[in-house]
Amino acid sequence: MAASSGSPQLATEDHLRKGEAVSGLHAVVAGSVSGLVARSVTAPMDTVKIRRQLQLASEHKYHGILHTFRTVAREEGVRALWKGNVPASAMYVLYGSLQFGTYAWLNTAAASAGLPPQAHSLAVGALAGLVSSLLTYPLDLLRTRLVANRSAHFFSLRRQARVIWDTEGPAGFFRGGAWAIAATTLTTGLIFGIYETCTIAADTYGLPWLAAAASPTAGLVSKAAVFPLDTVRRRLQIVDAKHIPFFTRDPGAYSALRGTRFLGLAVHMVRAEGIASLYKGLTMALCKSTPTTVITLWVYQRCLRLLEPTRAPQLPA
């Protein structure tokens, strides 16, 4: 890949760099594959994170990461660590294809806007996150409902969707959607912005270690920055559920909050459980975020190298 005139020769091939011309179809295919691979590897970690996020202060079922893993596997079977994997896998495939497809299109379309490369990546990444999260949110809600189920009985995706439709209506599939989309937009923007900042600095100053650290750094910082929003929206996704007794030992506590909006639920959590409740599951989330981001970006770049062995020249910054 050629560097633009007057800029340092790039040490690494980066399909996410400002102005990089990537086929929309190839971006969609690579994004789908990267999303599916990342989901398959990290699904059990996601289950543990969500269980921790949904546990009320009055409950003492799960104590720490390893205890949660063991408890879920012992009481519900090892397969339970992959509960919700069907909608989650579909979501990751669709999300990955939309995210990287939108990013590839905007990356060239907005290259002439005159933004610095780092700001360009952040803005394009945020818009890509907005589009992908908006169109995949119902799958995210279904995944949360299926993962939250603590019983050994597995609910089918079709049954859960039917229950939501019958008891909550079409709007039930978008419960907490606005804040979730805002959080995902911010997360995606931070991931791409931080990733490109690190890789540009690595190429400019000849720091291979910084290039290697780009993906995990982007994942950790982005996840930590928006985690409280993620925790509140997980609670919001189940608060109106018909099967709430399957999700908690204290269904009355959730039932009392039916109809509560995002900010009201956040305030209630802080008052009833302390500000630390907003960060329940953060350790697991950070442990999951690093491999998820690394796998997603690495597989995406790798797929494009296979799909596009000859690269188009980089547009001027």
UniProtKB/Swiss-Prot annotation:
Entry's Gene Ontology cellular component terms: mitochondrial inner membrane
Pfam family, one: Mito_carr
The UniProt record lists the keyword Mitochondrion: yes
Cellular localisation: Mitochondrion inner membrane
InterPro entries the record matches: Mit_carrier, Mitochondrial_sb/sol_carrier, Mt_carrier_dom_sf
Membrane association type: Multi-pass membrane protein
Single annotated GO MF: thiamine pyrophosphate transmembrane transporter activity
Domain of life: Eukaryota
Keywords from the named record: Membrane, Mitochondrion, Mitochondrion inner membrane, Repeat, Transmembrane, Transmembrane helix, Transport
Residue windows of the Solcar repeats: 22-109, 116-201, 206-306
GO biological process, alphabetically ordered: mitochondrial thiamine pyrophosphate transmembrane transport; thiamine pyrophosphate transmembrane transport
Main location: mitochondrion
TM spans (from-to): 21-41, 86-106, 122-142, 176-196, 207-227, 281-300
Function: Mitochondrial transporter that mediates uptake of thiamine pyrophosphate (ThPP) into mitochondria.
UniProt record similarity statement: Belongs to the mitochondrial carrier (TC 2.A.29) family.
Name the UniProt record assigns to this protein: Mitochondrial thiamine pyrophosphate carrier 1
